Design a protein with these regions (language model features):
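Interfacial segments of multi-pass membrane proteins
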Residues: 85-91, 181, 308-323, 329-334
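Juxtamembrane interface elements at the cytosolic ends of transmembrane helices
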Residues: 6-7, 34-37, 173-180, 191, ...
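Membrane-embedded helical hairpins/re-entrant loop segments and their flanking transmembrane helices
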Residues: 10-20, 42-63, 67-69, 249-320, ...
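Hydrophobic, membrane-embedded alpha-helices of multi-pass small-molecule transporters
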Residues: 20-35, 169-173, 191-192, 223-262, ...
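Membrane-embedded alpha-helical modules
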Residues: 105-213, 327-439
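Intrinsically disordered, low-complexity non-transmembrane regions of multi-pass membrane transporters
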Residues: 1-24, 212-232, 268-275, 283, ...
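N-terminal signal-anchor module of multipass membrane proteins
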Residues: 1-74, 78-103
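Short, non-helical or kinked segments that cap or interrupt transmembrane helices
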Residues: 46-51, 68-81, 135-144, 189-195, ...
Length: 453
């Protein structure tokens, strides 16, 4: 039955391809998200297995809430790395490299992630009640763009710190990612992070920079949940918990707009306006609840992945069932500590090289956000909002944020939190807010690109 299939117009029901091809397509989607998804736990100290479990479960939950209509995969969000670096910064090992997880503070960071997902849910309900155009006026590109720029700049020092562990591996990883992005074709262009890790890992093997001791002692099967990292058990009303909320929740204000761009990109690829059907309220709700689930279980925030949108465009297989197959495969892999041990052997220098370009790309995507939305910086209003956001984020971050006491509880506002609050307030107060969001044009909106935030 699958011998005479016309791929030119796209395949919307992959069952006609047969079980074997559907499985291969699912594996392809899993590899598309893999490099970026496992990099986040390596940069934050979270469990790779828990991250894969949360990506798989989050994707299935998203598909359930969106009625199985949207062919999107949810993986780890890079945008939240800035929040993790503030709430639970990696600790230095004996050689001075930032490789040790901050186990004391990670649960609070995950709790912040869980509550940030509820922001998506709240905005989803507001959109259902008041309409999408009224709500989106509070989150224009002149606010979200500079916040994304600041996230990348705040992370830059940690990238250099990791590179210093092994500059050779860092340059190989960095160079490979650049070559794949600029000159790569087809799947090579879609998988720059994964290929960068594989090539630099091969160099690490040749130079003897890989330690296999942990692999031999790891079990083949294990439960991918670790109580000590779960955000569920960190919701305790402590100053650490409150400060984590104020630090991480504002990031959701920026990532929501990236979500809109990604859904628009999927719409343009498939030829169906998912912003209208099943509706942005449902896609936001699905993404938000997936993020809340991940945070409660001790995983990073989830986000729709641009890499998988690229796979859709290449393969022309648009059936969401294929994405759900990839989600199930990710869940299966999460139950293997042996697999996690292999991932954890990736040298710090490689992580540094990948994050070198990755963190820069986060800031560059923020620039792209304001450029593609034609933000007019000859307008003093827009210039002031962007300037105050950037200085607030970077300036307060350099001095440890702003600490104050409310009802006997010490609360610390990070630079990102202050920047988001000030940006939204200035946008609401200053005259001249002419931003209009048009869901009918959603399929033409800019996406966040292949290096997903």
């Amino acid at each position: 039955m699958s011998q005479n299939i016309d791929y030119s117009k796209g395949i919307y029901d992959a069952r006609q391809l047969g079980a074997g091809r559907m499985l291969i397509l699912g594996v392809q989607h899993m590899f598309a998200m893999f490099g970026a998804t496992v990099l986040v736990p390596l940069l934050t100290g979270l469990s790779v297995s828990t991250t894969l479990l949360c990506a798989g479960l989050g994707t299935l939950l998203f598909h359930f809430i969106t009625k199985g209509k949207v062919p999107a995969f949810l993986g780890s969000s890079f945008a939240y790395l800035g929040g993790f670096s503030i709430v639970a910064p990696m600790l230095a090992d004996a050689d001075g490299n930032l490789t040790i997880a901050n186990t004391q503070m990670l649960p609070y960071a995950c709790a912040g992630v869980a509550f940030s997902g509820l922001v998506y849910l709240a905005v989803s309900l507001l959109i259902s009640t008041f309409g999408i155009r009224r709500i989106m006026r509070f989150f224009p590109p002149v606010v979200t763009g500079p916040i994304i720029i600041a996230i990348g700049l705040i992370l830059a020092p940690s990238a250099i710190s990791n590179c210093q562990a092994n500059w050779l591996l860092a340059f190989v990883a960095l160079g490979t990612v650049i070559v794949c992005n600029i000159w790569g074709k087809g799947m090579v262009k879609i998988l720059p992070i994964l290929i960068g890790v594989l090539v630099s890992y091969a160099v690490a093997l040749v130079t003897g920079a890989v330690d296999f001791e942990r692999i031999a002692s790891a079990a083949w099967f294990g439960i991918p949940l670790h109580k000590e990292a779960m955000g569920l058990f960190a919701i305790d009303g402590s100053p650490e918990f409150i400060s984590a909320l104020f630090t991480i929740i504002p990031i959701a204000l920026a990532t929501m707009m990236e979500h809109v761009g990604d859904i628009a990109a999927i719409s343009a690829t498939v030829g169906h306006n998912y912003i209208n059907d099943p509706g942005l309220n449902r896609t936001l709700m699905g993404d938000g609840l997936a993020t809340t689930l991940a945070g409660l279980l001790g995983g990073p925030a989830n986000t729709t992945y641009g890499e998988n949108t690229g796979v859709l465009a290449l393969s022309k297989i648009y059936d969401p069932l294929v994405i759900r197959n990839a989600a199930v495969l990710a869940i299966i892999l999460s139950f293997s500590p042996k697999f996690e041990a292999v991932i954890n052997t990736i040298p710090t220098g490689i992580i540094g090289g990948i994050s070198f370009v990755l963190y820069g790309m986060i800031s560059a995507i923020g620039v792209r956000n304001v450029v593609e939305n034609r933000v007019d910086f000859t307008n003093s209003r827009n210039l002031i909002i962007a300037a105050v956001i950037l200085v607030s984020a970077l300036g307060f971050n350099s001095v440890g944020g702003l600490t104050f006491v409310v009802a006997g509880v010490s609360i610390n506002l990070s630079g990102l939190a202050i920047a988001a609050i000030v940006g939204i307030l200035l946008n609401a107060i200053l005259p001249g807010n002419d931003y209009e969001f048009d869901s009918a044009d959603g399929a033409d909106a800019p996406s966040s690109g292949n290096l997903q935030v």
